[in-house]
């Protein structure tokens, strides 16, 4: 009987220990940097959807700050409205604010994570993900200046939508948002 109680106690102890470890791991927060209306987080690539989870990431990335700034400057969008104009996704003062932080994030991101960013602007938030594969740096946008991506010209509420305008050497692909 004494041996039965000992083994029963050991079994309960092991189950409690495993449960505590699992709860501790599940509660681990993503690494987050927040400064002056700009937030960066490293997120597991599997949480970003099936289109990204299939991509072989090449992280951390060896890239200079001037290169990141050129990328940011080259990103252009167009509002899908009657008088929609091509506009930069990031204004020069925004690039000045976030260029160094994005560079450091790309240089330090773990190989199985992607970078999620959110920039608060007077016109609304610009948010999305950035990650690198073998040949490309991928910029994925959820919203630009407060306008969320809906995949069609007008949203059900009549809000104007947008599309990316690829520049020389760029291409874009619209992926359905989950």
Which residue ranges define each predicted feature?
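C-terminal motif of bacterial Sec signal peptides marking the signal peptidase cleavage site
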Residues: 22-24
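Bacterial N-terminal signal peptides that target proteins for export
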Residues: 2-12
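Post-signal peptide N-terminal segment of mature Sec-exported envelope proteins
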Residues: 31-60
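Bacterial signal peptide processing site
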Residues: 26-29
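Mature extracellular/secreted ectodomains of secretory-pathway proteins
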Residues: 67-178
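Compositionally biased P/S/T/G-rich terminal and signal peptide-adjacent segments
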Residues: 55-73
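Bacterial N-terminal signal peptides
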Residues: 11-20
């Amino acid at each position: 009987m004494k041996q039965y109680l000992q083994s029963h106690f050991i079994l309960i102890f092991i189950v409690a220990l495993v449960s505590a470890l699992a709860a501790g791991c599940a509660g681990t927060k993503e690494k987050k940097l927040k400064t002056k209306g700009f937030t960066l987080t490293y997120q597991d690539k599997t949480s970003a959807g099936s289109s990204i989870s299939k991509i072989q990431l090449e992280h951390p990335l060896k890239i200079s700050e001037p290169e990141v700034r050129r990328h940011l400057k080259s990103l252009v969008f167009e509002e899908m409205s009657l008088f929609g104009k091509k506009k930069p996704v990031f204004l020069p003062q925004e690039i000045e604010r976030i260029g160094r932080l994005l560079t450091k994030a790309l240089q330090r991101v773990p190989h199985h994570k992607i970078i999620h960013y959110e920039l608060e602007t007077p016109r609304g938030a610009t948010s999305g993900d950035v990650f690198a594969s073998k040949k490309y740096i991928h910029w994925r946008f959820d919203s630009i200046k407060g306008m969320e991506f809906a995949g069609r010209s007008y949203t059900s509420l009549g809000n104007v939508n947008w599309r990316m305008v690829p520049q020389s050497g760029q291409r874009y692909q619209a992926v359905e948002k989950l």
